[in-house]
Swiss-Prot record:
Cleavable signal peptide: 1-22
SUPFAM superfamilies: Bacterial adhesins
A Gene Ontology biological process term: cell adhesion involved in single-species biofilm formation
Name of one Pfam family that matches: Fimbrial
PANTHER family with a match to the protein in the record: FIMBRIAL SUBUNIT ELFA-RELATED, FIMBRIN-LIKE PROTEIN FIMI-RELATED
Protein name, entry field: Major fimbrial subunit
Gene3D superfamilies named among the record's database cross-references: Fimbrial-type adhesion domain
Superkingdom, natural source: Bacteria
Function: Major structural component of PMF fimbriae.
Amino acid sequence: MKLSKIALAAALVFGINSVATAENETPAPKVSSTKGEIQLKGEIVNSACGLAASSSPVIVDFSEIPTSALANLQKAGNIKKDIELQDCDTTVAKTATVSYTPSVVNAVNKDLASFVSGNASGAGIGLMDAGSKAVKWNTATTPVQLINGVSKIPFVAYVQAESADAKVTPGEFQAVINFQVDYQ
């Protein structure tokens, strides 16, 4: 009985002490919210495939190319890239071709795209299609077989002197080549 009274007294003391401590505590500061936004965009198209976001635009970075690499009409850089198509349905089309159109065709060598900005000169950009054939601007490339789901259309971009006797001036350059995928 004596033990019960002691236990009861201890419980009352600790309970009262807990209430007193809780009354003296300052409340924790309110944690603020983080707010953001999700922007959604796209286009619904009536075609065999859709263009993957990674392919609009396709970025080709040649980094630095020495002028000596362009001697004797050599093709320098030779960067392999893909135009990636998504959600392809081969019941709609079995193959695809690509037509490439530079924003400006090189004035000296019509097979090259011209630099549109930067201070480099005497050279331009060329492309080879999936069949390793030189791309003719505004002309369909060798057909590429589509597969259900993701299909990739490879190409190779290169830098080349405008002519065998062109004076290539070092400097930065940019070029733009648009493309259109057609399905068969």
